[in-house]
Regions:
Chain B
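Helix-coil boundary and interhelical linker segments in multi-pass alpha-helical membrane proteins
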Residues: 1-5, 57-70, 120-131, 187-190
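Structural signature of hydrophobic alpha-helical transmembrane segments
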Residues: 3-18, 66-82, 133-146
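Hydrophobic core segments of alpha-helical transmembrane domains in multi-pass membrane transport
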Residues: 6, 13, 44, 49-53, ...
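Generic transmembrane alpha-helix signature in multi-pass membrane proteins
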Residues: 21-29, 88-93, 104-106, 113-126
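C-terminal ends of transmembrane helices
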Residues: 22-36, 84-98, 150-161
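Cytoplasmic-side transmembrane-helix entry/capping segments in multi-pass membrane proteins
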Residues: 35-46, 70-76, 98-110, 165-171
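Ordered, amphipathic secondary-structure segments that act as subunit-interaction surfaces
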Residues: 60-103
Length: 194, 190
């Protein structure tokens, strides 16, 4: 398989957020700022790549019937690793992401790639697939976070572009997440088809 | 009084879907018709309450007792996955009509982050057993309220002429945003 195609499909053609609508909970929940979105995206990427590697390695030893629970245990182990490392070295980000870090376990994107891709393909392709999908997911989260941060408080990555008093608070709050993602999805679909 | 506050807060103010962003996948996925929305709500309520009780005991008597709370994520998700299977088998045997009604939704529930989310929230807020049951039940009611309202709106949405670029997911997300805005009216209630 063409590895470049395999890698790049996660960004536009099969973007997990805008096209496949997977992993919506963290997408909406943590993107009140661009940096939170990026942090969540990279944490998910790590879990995705590692679980893809392990699943691709052990796929021949797992009986068909218990494969889903086995995949969940593999994913949960890496999530625990991320949780502990983040708590130790990035406590501020850990606080901001909160509940959504343990919830990476039930992110349908991670289980979906393990089941649909890594359990059927070679180690190399699985790593590339995990990287592409994970970075595509990170890109989507960062974009959404940047849009919400910009409209909500006039900043991007904490850099002030205009006065905070012009910001629309609604974009930082819950409804803004849905609305911003709705319009962003429409926009990306338009660009994708053009 | 504390119980009352937990109920109002979980259903309206901190609605699990519209303000906590948990369970978005079923919220967007099975909300095309009111009837499927009701079925999903039933299945979620059932599993959520049982899962919260079971994980409460696991946290209390196994994880904390042996000082292995770092295994929380792994043990909780395994318990929930096993529980969903168990509920499915028991329901099939004990109550075929109920199984008929909820059956198709049960496998989807393992990856519903609302279940794991509520279990973890219960533990991190130090609820006792009664509070945990009340909290999980009212969270499920909140999930149902959001899901069924949204399904009702989407049924109406089928009849209108949506601009081409906004069809499908984008318009659903914008509608969900407006619904979330309506729920923000409850803020400050408790």
């Amino acid at each position: 398989m063409n590895q470049w195609k395999n890698f790049s499909k996660g960004f536009f053609k099969d973007n997990p957020v805008f096209v496949m609508l997977l992993g919506m909970c963290p997408t909406l929940g943590v993107t009140s700022s661009a940096i939170n979105g990026l942090g969540m995206g990279l944490a998910t990427t790590f879990v995705l790549v590692m679980s893809n590697i392990v699943v691709a390695l052990v796929k021949d030893f797992i009986p068909e019937k218990v494969r889903i629970p086995s995949f969940i245990v593999i994913i949960a182990s890496f999530v625990t690793v991320v949780e502990m490392v983040m708590q130790a070295y990035l406590p501020a980000l850990f606080e901001a992401l909160g509940l959504f870090i343990p919830l990476i376990v039930v992110n349908c994107l991670v289980l979906g790639r393990a089941e649909a891709f890594a359990s059927k393909n070679t180690l190399g392709s699985s790593v590339v697939d995990g990287l592409g999908m994970g970075l595509g997911f990170s890109m989507a989260l960062t974009m959404l976070g940047a849009v919400r941060e910009l409209f909500g408080s006039g900043k991007i990555f904490g850099l002030s572009l205009f006065s905070e008093s012009y910001g629309m608070l609604i974009f930082v709050l819950a409804p803004g997440a849905f609305i911003a993602l709705g319009y962003l999805t429409a926009f990306i679909n338009k660009v994708r088809k053009a | 009084m504390t119980y009352f506050i937990i109920i109002i807060s979980a259903i309206f103010v901190n609605n699990i879907v519209l303000s906590q962003f948990l369970g978005i996948c079923p919220f967007l996925g099975v909300s095309k018709k009111i009837s499927t929305g009701i079925g999903m709500t039933g299945a979620v309520t059932f599993v959520m309450v049982i899962a919260t009780i079971v994980t409460y005991f696991i946290q209390e008597f196994i994880l904390e007792k042996f000082g292995i709370t770092y295994l929380q994520t792994i043990s909780f998700i395994l318990v929930i996955a096993a529980l969903v299977q168990l509920v499915e088998i028991v329901l099939k045997k004990v109550s075929p009509p109920l199984y008929q009604a909820l059956g198709v939704f049960l496998p989807l529930i393992t990856t519903n982050c609302a279940i794991l989310g509520v279990a973890i929230m219960t533990v991190s807020r130090d609820y006792n057993l009664i509070e945990a049951v009340i909290f999980s039940a009212s969270s499920a009611v909140g999930f149902g309220l959001a899901l069924i309202t949204f399904a009702g709106i989407r049924e109406q949405l089928d009849l209108v002429n949506v601009p081409k670029g906004m069809q499908g997911a984008p318009i659903a997300l914008v509608v969900a945003g407006l619904l979330a805005m309506a729920f923000m009216g409850f803020a400050g209630l408790v």
